[in-house]
């Protein structure tokens, strides 16, 4: 077995990247954590939800505390550069990593934890309202908004499912379908019985103060009336971060747009793992931590069983 500069390189320093690094640090592994300062998907969120012991804590604080823990491990090194190239060396069963300053190093295993970027719909004025009024996870914020007027934006077949889930938190729910609503007669009857309103008008623009009520300006509204909502839930489309590196390694991407992984979060390329939001549609902090721990556990066991390692 050849000598490598590090046992593992972790690309990405959000929740999943930090969790994987912490696990491997406790396993006494040599780890390089590559943090290009990209920020986490939820870096603007005020709270991290459904994380045991961190009920009212900001994502920034959790990440800061974890980084402080990592400072205690002398085999963990940090790097603020970007990874430009990853080349597998099959004869050595390792990888050659080239960084953005043209330096290179060798590692036994690679963990991608670079996440995804959400893509907001093309609605004028929507950007400032993300994520203070625009949400993709009702299980995080909806309880705090219970009883307030809410909206769903879903110009696809998910509108019925989303309405059935979200109506639990409010009796004043409007579903924007951006055109003809594709509900069956049975579904439409059920939504009517629940008091859920369907609006097929196009949203031309939104305005207001982020974190307060949003004004929805609708197409064809001759009276120029606006609909006030405290928040709008959207099943957002997203794109993988660091797609160039993913394609460079020829990793398989699923039809849903995530990296294909096995039960240990190993990708289609042996020795390369993907954790967090880029590897699963259950895109929560809790899953980011789980996937990172599973991958790190599998890597440590695999390296331990290599001959003469």
Regions found by a protein language model. Name each.
Residues 1-9, 77-147, 218-223, 233-235, ...:
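FAD-binding core/adjacent interface of flavoenzyme oxidoreductases
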Residues 6-64, 158-181:
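Beta1-alpha1 glycine-rich phosphate/pyrophosphate-binding loop at the start
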Residues 14-15, 118, 157-158, 279-280:
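Residue-level detector of alpha-helix initiation sites
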């Amino acid at each position: 077995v050849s000598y490598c500069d590090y046992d593992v390189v972790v690309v990405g320093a959000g929740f999943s990247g930090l969790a994987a690094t912490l696990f491997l640090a406790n396993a006494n592994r040599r780890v390089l954590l590559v943090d290009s300062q990209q920020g986490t998907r939820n870096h603007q969120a005020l709270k991290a939800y459904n994380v045991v012991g961190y009920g009212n804590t900001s994502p920034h604080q959790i990440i800061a505390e974890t980084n402080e823990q990592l400072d205690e491990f002398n085999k963990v090194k940090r790097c603020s550069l970007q990874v430009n190239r990853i080349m597998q060396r099959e004869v050595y069963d390792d990888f050659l990593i080239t960084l953005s300053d043209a330096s290179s190093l060798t590692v036994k295993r690679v963990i991608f934890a670079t996440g995804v970027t959400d893509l907001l719909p093309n609605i004028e004025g929507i950007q400032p309202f993300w994520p203070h009024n625009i949400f993709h996870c009702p299980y995080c914020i909806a309880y705090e908004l219970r009883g307030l007027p809410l909206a769903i934006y879903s110009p696809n077949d998910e509108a019925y499912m989303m309405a059935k889930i979200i109506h639990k938190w409010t009796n004043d729910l409007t579903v924007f379908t951006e055109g003809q609503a594709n509900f069956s007669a049975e579904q439409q009857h059920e939504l009517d019985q629940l008091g859920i309103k369907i609006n097929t008008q196009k949203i031309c623009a939104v305005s207001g103060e982020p974190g307060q009520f949003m004004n929805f300006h609708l197409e064809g509204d001759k009276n120029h009336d606006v609909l006030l909502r405290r928040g709008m839930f959207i099943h957002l489309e997203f794109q993988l971060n660091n797609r160039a590196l993913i394609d460079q390694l020829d990793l398989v991407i699923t039809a849903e747009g995530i990296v294909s992984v096995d039960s240990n979060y190993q990708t289609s390329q042996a020795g390369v793992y993907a954790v967090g939001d880029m590897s699963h549609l259950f895109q929560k902090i809790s899953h980011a931590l789980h996937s990172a721990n599973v991958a790190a556990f599998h890597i440590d066991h695999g390296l331990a069983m290599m001959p003469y390692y």
